[in-house]
Curated annotation (Swiss-Prot):
Function of the protein: Carrier of the growing fatty acid chain in fatty acid biosynthesis.
Name listed for the protein in its UniProt record: Acyl carrier protein
GO biological process: lipid A biosynthetic process
Keyword tags: Cytoplasm, Fatty acid biosynthesis, Fatty acid metabolism, Lipid biosynthesis, Lipid metabolism, Phosphopantetheine, Phosphoprotein
Family: Belongs to the acyl carrier protein (ACP) family.
């Protein structure tokens, strides 16, 4: 997943979850102030992203998550860690 795909997925989940137009969702949008999310909404968003990426988010990783951009950075980090773990699990190609 690249940055654009991650944003589109977050945008889709938030629009469905919150019942708001996708156009209202930007990287700069504050989850609470601009989008009206509460802590339960954040848990549901993270759960959907965990399912999408296939990795779990630690509670400590949620600290400081205030904007859609922060959610994107967290998701990009998870995708990168998953790719690194997958590469480490693959046996080296025979020479």
């Amino acid at each position: 997943m690249d940055r654009k795909e991650i944003f589109e997925r977050i945008e889709q989940v938030l629009a469905e979850q919150l019942g708001i137009p996708a156009e209202q969702i930007t990287e700069e949008a504050d989850l609470r102030e601009d989008l009206g999310m509460d802590s339960l909404d954040l848990v549901e968003l993270v759960s959907a992203l965990e399912d999408e990426v296939g990795m779990r988010v630690e509670q400590s990783q949620l600290e400081g998550i205030e904007t859609v951009g922060h959610v994107m950075e967290l998701t990009l980090d998870l995708v990168a860690r998953l790719a690194t773990a997958s590469a480490a699990d693959k046996p080296e190609a025979a020479s």
